[in-house]
């Protein structure tokens, strides 16, 4: 029997090792298509392997139970297929003459622990707190749902009689976390922490591969690490000029750099990283005359499906913009070398494999189109007041510069630098990388999502951000300190912007990783959160994993920066029949905004102490709340209706703390 602790380090480590093993087992043979350098293939393999595994296994496990034996058989089977399709000599997309050494791998691993640290519990006195990103990791409930009940996942955030209650969300990344949970016995929270850290590391690997391979300089690997940890320049501008910025800029939420996105939304970072791999595979299919593209087309199809299945924005919408443009730019070359039929056949194979792997996800997610509008056109508001004609240039000249500072300015320097003979040899790659930067940024400017917040705007540009970081790393490694115009501009950019950008990123890491441990405060809710595993263990003992519980949507709301019942989401390992409003809007997307508000208000009123026996009956019969969990913090605690009703009976309690009814 596991002790009632929040997370165990051994489970996190074992989950990380399982994810890495899956990635390398499947991705290692496929990496031959991208680079001939063995060390560089170590950088590419895990993302490729996890991408292929995620898409294929999600489809398979809609028909098979998710067990450790089945998972190992699927991994072995996919690894065998990957080795078979990659056997023999393969002419890679790039042949890197340099690669990072062991010291770089060690430093990269240690730095990429930081995003994982932002979602682990932090102790101060008798209390436990969590960093701000944990709010977006309420999706740990999805990991637990898949691990316990298989696919397709039921919605762990809402249940209602007469409704299919299917989860409408892109969950391939969470499925991968659930697989490591099944194999190791880790909780959803532990598996989520592990995969968050591994996603950050593998994303860093791919950025570094591109930086080193394109610049042909091992020093680019060292530049990639600080550049991934840069933050927005806005705090630095505020520090120098006070509130001057707020007076003339619109209050719209800005964009986010890698060090913000990696701990908050690892599924989107994973998807954006896969998008970068897919673009490179696409380039080889379009421009390589060496053959073997049919096998690569199969792998690309699975990677595309996994990118889509992990993020509708970073790996789906971004690629819908990038790939057609890159393809259009390649037409003259394809016609010149008379490879049109070969390319069309390869791309047809890619499309077929993508649809086969993504079909179940497309079918599940298409249900949202019947109830909700997903995106709207707009012009990203930059300046205060209704000056859209100024907002258009302001987006590129002001907002993107403030948000992405050093990597955006360096990308512009790289774009206008005089091409060398080496650059001309890779002109098709450079052209594709330029498109990969500009197309997602343009999308952010003219489209925004409306389900909840502007997730589209923040996530669709992840491939753009990764490419800019790689290009900046390469630029710095080859031009800093040189007497040319490009060298001087690059040196000045690094001197002025690097330090403040890293300081802003470091401040974000400190706030989410160490601040609570240093400053506290010690609070009643923090103490209750620390003790909550005992309550949820008792809930699991009386509640099967395929049933839902009713618990106050606002229980321990002060633990997170935005009020939410994070204790249920990350610790209960059970479904909830009506959770926090933000969670209902985001993850029960089949509900209209009005319906989501009605459900949320119903549960809030009930736990505030206004519940009658009829309310309790509606809970149990309409919303399928088989278990009712009441704590001493709830207004419902001690109300006579709990002792005198025909709906729920007391089955477990800890005197003065909590009671469980069935």
Curated annotation (Swiss-Prot):
GO terms for cellular component: plasma membrane. Its main location: membrane. It is a multi-pass membrane protein. It is found in: Cell membrane. The chain crosses the membrane at residues 10-30, 46-66, 68-88, 101-121, 167-187, 193-213, 217-237, 263-283, 285-305, 312-332, 342-362, 373-393, 394-414, 432-452, 460-480, 485-505. Keywords: Cell membrane, Membrane, Plasmid, Transmembrane, Transmembrane helix. This is Uncharacterized protein y4nK.
């Amino acid at each position: 029997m596991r002790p009632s602790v929040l997370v165990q380090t051994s489970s996190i480590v074992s989950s990380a090792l399982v994810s890495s093993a899956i990635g390398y087992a499947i991705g290692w043979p496929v990496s031959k298509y991208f680079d001939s350098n063995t060390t560089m293939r170590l950088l590419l393999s895990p993302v490729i392997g996890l991408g292929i595994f995620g898409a294929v296994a999600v489809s398979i496990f809609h028909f098979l139970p998710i067990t450790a034996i089945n998972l190992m058989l699927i991994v072995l089977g996919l690894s065998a297929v990957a080795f078979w399709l990659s056997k023999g000599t393969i002419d890679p997309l790039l042949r890197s003459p340099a690669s990072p050494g062991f010291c770089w791998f060690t430093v990269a691993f240690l730095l990429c622990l930081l995003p994982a640290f932002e979602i682990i519990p932090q102790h101060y006195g008798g209390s436990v707190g969590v960093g701000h990103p944990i709010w977006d990791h309420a999706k740990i409930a999805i990991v637990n749902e898949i691990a316990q009940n298989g696919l397709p996942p039921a919605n762990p955030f809402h249940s209602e009689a007469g409704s299919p209650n299917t989860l409408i969300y892109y969950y391939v990344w969470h499925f991968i976390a659930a697989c490591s949970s099944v194999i190791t016995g880790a909780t959803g929270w532990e598996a989520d922490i592990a995969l968050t850290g591994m996603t950050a590391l593998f994303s860093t690997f791919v950025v570094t591969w591109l930086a080193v391979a394109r610049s042909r300089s091992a020093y680019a690997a060292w530049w990639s690490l600080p550049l991934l940890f840069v933050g927005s320049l806005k705090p630095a501008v505020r520090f120098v000029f006070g509130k001057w910025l707020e007076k003339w800029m619109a209050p719209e939420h800005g964009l986010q750099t890698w060090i913000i996105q990696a701990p908050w939304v690892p599924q989107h970072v994973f998807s954006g990283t896969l998008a970068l791999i897919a673009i490179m595979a696409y380039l080889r299919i379009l421009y390589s005359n060496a053959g073997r593209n049919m096998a690569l087309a199969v792998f690309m199809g699975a990677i595309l499906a996994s990118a889509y299945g992990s993020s509708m924005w970073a790996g789906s919408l971004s690629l819908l913009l990038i790939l057609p443009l890159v393809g259009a730019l390649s037409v003259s070359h394809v016609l010149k070398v008379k490879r049109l039929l070969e390319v069309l056949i390869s791309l047809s194979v890619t499309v077929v494999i993508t649809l086969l792997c993504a079909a179940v996800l497309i079918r599940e997610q298409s249900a949202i189109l019947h109830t909700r509008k997903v995106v709207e056109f707009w012009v990203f508001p930059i300046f205060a007041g209704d000056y859209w004609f100024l907002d258009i240039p302001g987006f590129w000249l002001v907002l993107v510069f403030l948000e992405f500072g050093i990597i955006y300015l360096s990308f512009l320097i790289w774009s206008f630098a005089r091409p060398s003979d080496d650059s001309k040899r890779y002109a098709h790659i450079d052209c594709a990388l330029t498109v990969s930067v500009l197309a997602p940024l343009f999308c952010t400017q003219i489209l925004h999502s409306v389900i909840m917040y502007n997730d589209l705007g923040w996530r669709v540009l992840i491939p753009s951000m990764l490419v800019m970081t790689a290009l900046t790393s390469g630029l710095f490694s080859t031009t800093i300190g040189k007497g040319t115009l490009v060298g001087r501009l690059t040196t000045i950019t690094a001197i002025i912007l690097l330090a403040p950008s890293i300081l802003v990123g470091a401040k974000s890491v400190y706030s989410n990783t160490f601040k609570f441990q240093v400053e506290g405060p010690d609070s009643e809710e923090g103490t209750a959160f620390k003790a909550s595993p005992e309550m949820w263990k008792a809930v699991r003992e009386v509640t099967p994993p395929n049933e839902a519980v009713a618990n106050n949507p606002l229980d321990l709301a002060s633990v997170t920066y935005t009020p939410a019942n994070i204790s249920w989401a990350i610790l209960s390992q059970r479904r909830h029949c009506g959770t926090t409003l933000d969670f209902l809007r985001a993850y029960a997307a089949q509900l209209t905004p009005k319906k989501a508000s009605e459900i949320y208000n119903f549960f809030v009123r009930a736990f505030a102490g206004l519940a009658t026996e009829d309310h309790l009956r509606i809970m149990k019969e309409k919303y399928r709340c088989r278990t009712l969990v009441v704590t001493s913090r709830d207004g419902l605690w001690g109300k006579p209706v709990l002792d005198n009703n025909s709906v729920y009976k007391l089955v477990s309690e800890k005197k003065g703390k909590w009671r469980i009814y069935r």
